[in-house]
A protein has these predicted regions:
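Accessory, often C-terminal, charged low-complexity segments
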Residues: 1-156
Length: 156
C-alpha cells in the first residue's frame, strides 16, 4: 500500500516538478482552487510540452493517503455536489462550496445523515465553514498538500 502511494506520487508529481519552487508553493497554498474539487486542472509539463491536465482530486487523495475504499456515494445538498468516500477507518468528503451561501447548520446535519462521523473525517474546506466544536475533521487540502510536498522537493 505504501509503495503504491509512493509510486503514484512520484509518477504524478513528475508532471510538474520542473516548474519553479515559487509557482509550486503558490499552487499548494491557494485554498480557493479547491472550492470546486470536481473541476480541477493543473498546467503541467508532459514530454517538454506545457499542457493543462485535469486532476481527479478524489482518486489522487485516496491513492496518496492509502485509503482502503469500501464505498463511494454521490449526494447533492443545496444544488451542490458532494462525494462521500467511505474508507475502512475514515470518511473523505469532497464538495463544491461557497462559504457565503452555505447554511452551515443544515450542512452539518446533511453530513451526519450521510456518513459515519465516528470515523476519522477529511473534508475539503472544513476550515472555511465549520468550527472544530461542530465537527472534528481534518482539512483534506492541508493533508493533500503534505502528501504532495512529501513527494517533491520544491525548495531545490
Amino acid at each position: 500500500k505504501e509503495h503504491m502511494s509512493e509510486l503514484y506520487a512520484s509518477k504524478y508529481l513528475s508532471l510538474y516538478k520542473d516548474f519553479t519552487a515559487r509557482e509550486s508553493k503558490a499552487l499548494l497554498m491557494d485554498d480557493s482552487i479547491f472550492f470546486n474539487p470536481f473541476d480541477f486542472s493543473l498546467i503541467v509539463n508532459i514530454d517538454s510540452q506545457i499542457v493543462e491536465k485535469k486532476m481527479d482530486l478524489v482518486e489522487t487523495f485516496n491513492t496518496l493517503k492509502g485509503i482502503e475504499v469500501e464505498g463511494i456515494k454521490l449526494r447533492y445538498f443545496e444544488d451542490k455536489k458532494y462525494i462521500f468516500v467511505d474508507g475502512k477507518n475514515e470518511v473523505v468528503i469532497w464538495r463544491e462550496f461557497d462559504k457565503e451561501s452555505l447554511d452551515i447548520a443544515k450542512e452539518l446535519d446533511f453530513i451526519k445523515e450521510n456518513c459515519d462521523i465516528t470515523k476519522e473525517l477529511y473534508i475539503n474546506g472544513i476550515t472555511q465553514t465549520h468550527t472544530k466544536k461542530e465537527l472534528v475533521a481534518k482539512e483534506s487540502i492541508f493533508e493533500l498538500r503534505a502528501l504532495l510536498v512529501e513527494g517533491v522537493k520544491i525548495d531545490e
